[in-house]
Amino acid sequence: MYTDPYFSRFVLPEDLKEALQKSRFLCYPETIEQLAEMSYGPAHSSRYDVSYSIAGKGLVKEAEVARCKNGTVVNFMEDYMRRRDPDCMSIGDDLPTDKPRFSDRYGYPFAELRKETMDWLSTQQLILLPFKAGGPYFGYESLMVCPVNAAFFALALANMQGFTSIFDVHDEYKPRAIIYVAPPFRHTHFNGRQAVIHQRCEDLHEVFSYNLYPGPSAKKGVFSMLLDIGEHEGWITNHASAAMLESPYENEVVFMHEGASGGGKSEMLEEIHEEEDGKLLLGVHTVTGEKHYLTLRETCKIHPIADDMVMAHKDMQDDGGFLKIVDAEDGWFLRMDGDTGYGCNAEYERLSIHPSEPLVFFNMDGVPGATCLIWEHIPDSDGTPCTNPRMIIPRRMTDNIIPGNEPQEVEVRSFGVRMPPSTDEHPDYGVMGMVQFVPVSLAWVWRLVSPRGYKNPSIADSNAGSGLKAEGVGSYWPFATGKKVTQANMLLHQMLDCPNTLNILIPNQHIGAYKVGFMGEWLVREYLARHNGTIKMKHLVPARCPIFGYSLDEMKLDGQYIRQTFLRPELQSHLEDGGYDAGAKILTDFFKEQLQQFLTDDLDPLGRQIIELVLRDAPLEDYLALTPMNLK
């Protein structure tokens, strides 16, 4: 039986405790540098193969780890393992869930596979990595159990959630969540597919990761843990980015931007993209080719808060009427597919080429001893660059970042949607104005549906005939393990408790016939930051489509007016009322289809009233009667 001076500090499930006691070797990393060095294998080589002996297949090479000047570069042998499989989640317990259960999917109880997993772990040399799920300041004590030869996986988790040295682990350390990593089971039990099984109980959330791509476990698996813990305790981890904008007039306004994949979360943290002459290309008319430009003498300074996961813990909240948030991560798992050559993203290129500490890269061309360049993506088997190149940037390396231990009040809560081009000849649902102001009731409805929308870069499937597909409650539903209605109720109350937060909708890609990319999002950010995150009712007009709330009657930036055709698309000559109404009907019909599933006995009565308004095409006034807007 294996024992060591640290093992007794942990309070663990009995079967895990037994497996660890049988293990040949347990490693407790003392420093993150030690953990990084372990990624290169026992010989500390410049290139290390992560392989496993699989019955009937022999030695299977899962990944290759290269030691580059600027960090650790990991590449998977299979194209399939270079990105998250959205169907990999199953639930291994009997608690309430709307997700597929393991027993239904595979035909036998998860308890059997759990025992096999523990038996396999007991034969391995293992890393025990304590960490804080939710970040180092407000997170929950957790643990990862991982084979030593997959140390890169532990390194990725430590960079995303923060490294905890074994020296900092106190006696009676009882994890609230545990991640188990057992890569061979992908081949022996799941026919080569990714599988991540969640097992929940009252005081423990366990994630069994049977594959080595960290997306569904070290990244989104932690998101699942936090959503489950929050469900028990009454708070939410939102799928959002957040930033404090400091205007040229020294106003400071905190934005939190939600949305389905491709909804503009990462763009909220980006500087405005300028043309070579410094002008801003507001939009290009898809019919006439006409271009509209704008010039800003000075733009807002961006102070990032969070990139993807925003913790709104109940203990942070007060009665001030604003949602208080912090980053739920200590490092960001950034997708670099848009960086296709030198100069595409100067900030991340600078951070990655000469980092202050070694980084971790995935799906990039890493040559031992050389510098990994974030625009050199590993080729997939067909010769094309991998579409999911990633790097992990610790928060502490990001310029102007808000410290992770300082909760911020959200003054503007935006929701982004990818929109298609829309004209009277070819009407589609891309008829939202550059910014729409909505009451809580409508802001909540948009988050229940979380439409993925037009030409999503991350998602291949689409809803037949419309290009629309719902990502589900809060856009975090793909990572939740419980019931949709439970999350819907929690989200409604989170928003009702923040009457002073301004709720807005922002389209990207197109506004009617104009191709705009993310320029609308950046300009709305600039406009509201200059107005201290507020708007006066006298500047609003009811949108022609009720679920869009109010439109802005005019927008002025640096003395320049934005054309009304961007604010109220029905005024566009190639769209007009007829094309607008046809496009709005596509969207509202989709909402009606998606909202039906929430009409259960467990839905909050106010939530039922709101959904019924959508189903009967109620006017904006009816939504305002249920949830008034706190505007002057």
Short names for language-model regions:
Residues M1-G215:
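Long, basic/Gly/Ser/Thr-rich N-terminal segments
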Residues Y2-K61, L334-K632:
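Conserved NTP phosphate-binding and transfer environment spanning the P-loop NTPase/kinase superfamily
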Residues Y137, G215, G263-S266, E276-G278, ...:
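Flexible loop/turn segments at secondary-structure boundaries
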Residues G215-P248:
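N-terminal pre-Walker A segment at the start of P-loop NTPase domains
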Residues E250-L280:
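Glycine-rich phosphate-binding P-loop
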Residues V254-M256, D319-F333, G517-A529:
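Conserved, well-ordered active-site substructure
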Residues L281, T286-E376:
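Conserved nucleotide-sensing/catalytic segment adjacent to the nucleotide-binding pocket
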